Amino acid sequence: MNERFLIEIEGLNKTFDDGFVSVRDINLKIKKGEFITILGPSGCGKTTTLRLLAGFEDPTYGKIKVNGLDIKDLPIHKRPFATVFQDYALFSHLTVYKNIAYGLKAMYTKLDPIDKLVEQYHQSLLDKQHRLHKRIERLEKSNANPQLLEQLKQTVVVQQKQFKQQTETFKQKENARRDAIQQRLVQLTKEWESLSKQKLQQLEAEKKLLDKKFEQTERKYQKDAWMATHSEMRLKQFKQEVLALKQLIKTKFKQNEPVDKLQLKLQTLKQKYAAKRQIDKEYDKLVLAYNKKDYWTSYWETYSLQQQEAFEKRYLSRKLTKQEQHQKVCAVIELVGLKGNEDKLPEELSGGMKQRVALARSLVIEPDILLLDEPLSALDAKVRKNLQKELQKIHQQSGLTFILVTHDQEEALVLSNRIVVMNEGNILQVGSPADIYDSPKTEWIANFIGQANIFKGTYLGDLKIKLHSGEVIKTDVDNNYVVGKEYKILIRPEDFDIVPKNKGFFNVRVIDKTYKGLLWKITTKLVDDTIVDLESVNDIEVDKTFGVTFDPIDVHLMEV
């Protein structure tokens, strides 16, 4: 049975005008209700990925599917996302209550069920009767205008006889009206789907023609060896190479050394780049044309759905009443812990409170997916930890899909169902917090997530590894390692146990120590000068030698 995913990112790329590639053809699938954290250092592409999802940036190419439909070209307000920003972005002149309620002004809900409308109509007739009875009572007390009094009494009798019939007539009319709307919607949906199918077939044929032109243009690059190896060269890199050659020619000339070959190389570089630029222009035109086709493909793929939503919004929906808005605002204020602060302005709030308001404002509009752009990074440590717990609680209670962007490894490990590790625009690993921390795929990930001790060794078979320093250790993880192949071995500092000298797997000598409150960070050396960091609850003197042990489950092998 195929798994259902709420979000599917396919081959997503973002290349800026200066040629910088921020997001490199990434692929990611997210299930409904997950808490996903995109983790990485500054400049890794995580925030750009979030902005692409939200619609604040347009991708160079690739797809962003939600419930199977590509939404990358949908405007921001039509996407099923809400975003919580790092800088809060609150309205300074509005109270907490009004900031949260702001998005509800444009929110629609389905029309009330017919039975409820009939009940409301029934009540309006009762209210009308009640007002007539009150008027009759006043006239009877005053003994004024007996003729009018008699007319009103007759009116009450007539209305009572017609009461049931009026209610039934109203119900029949409302049923007939809604049936007609539904029939019209079914008819229009068929027309919209037929039109979109026709347009998509036409676009597919046009894309195939463009694909052939792409192949022809790419063959032009391959005809020349220089172009084949420099097809990605940008103007900035070309200028740098020209300047470097000119500087070298100038230096050689001053030293009375021959420069003919360098001048020829410079001239050839300019000619080759000029020829390449002509092909680049052809290629760029094709990319522009293809992107336009891709835009319209995305448009027509969602055309029928958008038309249905617009139709339902107009004929089968209504705006929220003030009472409904108030109920939603009060519920979300309770959820995020803002009760008692409804009438305060943002300037009267702490950073943590402001972030709660920003979170509440996003939650109140009931998005399918909540995007969190480093919302806790500007807060102090204690407030941040408290809000982390609040986020976990809100995620569990709301059942929404959360996508958090952060560079804080601890935050990612604490909050997430799954972590997406990014660097230089690439997704390096996707997994549970335990997988990412305990079984990183690369040395870079191991060092980025927490502290890591990396050893080099050779796999001997039978789950045994021989370290370069000569010691033989064991792992209990069998991942089809190749006998005789060199691997990098990860052991976390907290996984070491300190034992007396010569009683462990190997001995280490203390070269430094740092007190960290609950623990001491002890820096040691192996006999081959390999640095080993470990943790101890007790202070250990510098230059002391002792043994260390660890469990095989804590030994993780990585490709070199």
Swiss-Prot record:
It is found in: Cell membrane. One of its GO terms (molecular function) is ABC-type polyamine transporter activity. SUPFAM superfamilies: MOP-like (SSF50331), P-loop containing nucleoside triphosphate hydrolases (SSF52540). Residues 7-449 form the ABC transporter domain. It is a peripheral membrane protein. One of its GO terms (cellular component) is plasma membrane. Its EC number is 7.6.2.11. Residues 108-318 are annotated as: Insert. The keyword Coiled coil does not apply. Keywords: ATP-binding, Cell membrane, Membrane, Nucleotide-binding, Translocase, Transport. PROSITE patterns: ABC_TRANSPORTER_1, ABC_TRANSPORTER_2, POTA. The complex is composed of two ATP-binding proteins (PotA), two transmembrane proteins (PotB and PotC) and a solute-binding protein (PotD). Part of the ABC transporter complex PotABCD involved in spermidine/putrescine import. Responsible for energy coupling to the transport system. Belongs to the ABC transporter superfamily. Spermidine/putrescine importer (TC 3.A.1.11.1) family. This is Spermidine/putrescine import ATP-binding protein PotA. It comes from Mycoplasma pneumoniae (strain ATCC 29342 / M129 / Subtype 1). The lineage of its organism: Bacteria, Bacillati, Mycoplasmatota, Mycoplasmoidales, Mycoplasmoidaceae. The gene is potA.
